[in-house]
């Protein structure tokens, strides 16, 4: 009985984890409109903030042509990578996770918006 409950709990946990990553890139492109004054996701061009093209899987503070804040440089120490988990920690409140960041965006509160924007950042072409 105990093993049976453990198996059911494992399946439910795996299902929930899989659904977290199932965002809609088209909806994410709409969410990204909140970001586009400072970032681009489809070109390797910096604006006020660094280009986010290829950001998912990229080391933190690694765009060579962008001048990161001391806070972001310090945050990047230890080899942090912008994976889904770290983006889910950062995007709801950038200033909370990286105290002293120059990013003034207040954050994304909706888990659906997070799912969608991550799907878009992973593959902006999927929004076409």
Where are these regions (language model features)?
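N-terminal signal peptide c-region/cleavage motif recognized by signal peptidases
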Residues: 16-17
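Bacterial N-terminal signal peptides that target proteins for export
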Residues: 1-7
């Amino acid at each position: 009985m105990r093993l049976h409950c453990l198996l059911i709990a494992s399946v439910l946990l795996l299902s929930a984890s899989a659904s977290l990553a199932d965002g809609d890139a088209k909806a994410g492109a709409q969410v990204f409109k909140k970001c586009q004054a400072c970032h681009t996701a489809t070109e390797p061009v910096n604006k006020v903030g660094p280009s986010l093209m290829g950001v998912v899987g990229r080391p933190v503070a690694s765009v060579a042509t962008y001048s990161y804040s001391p806070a972001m440089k310090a945050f990047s120490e230890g080899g942090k990578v912008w994976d889904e988990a770290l983006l889910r920690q950062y995007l709801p409140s950038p200033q909370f996770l990286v105290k002293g960041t120059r990013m003034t965006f207040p954050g994304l509160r909706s888990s659906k918006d997070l799912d969608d924007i991550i799907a878009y950042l992973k593959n902006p072409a999927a929004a076409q």
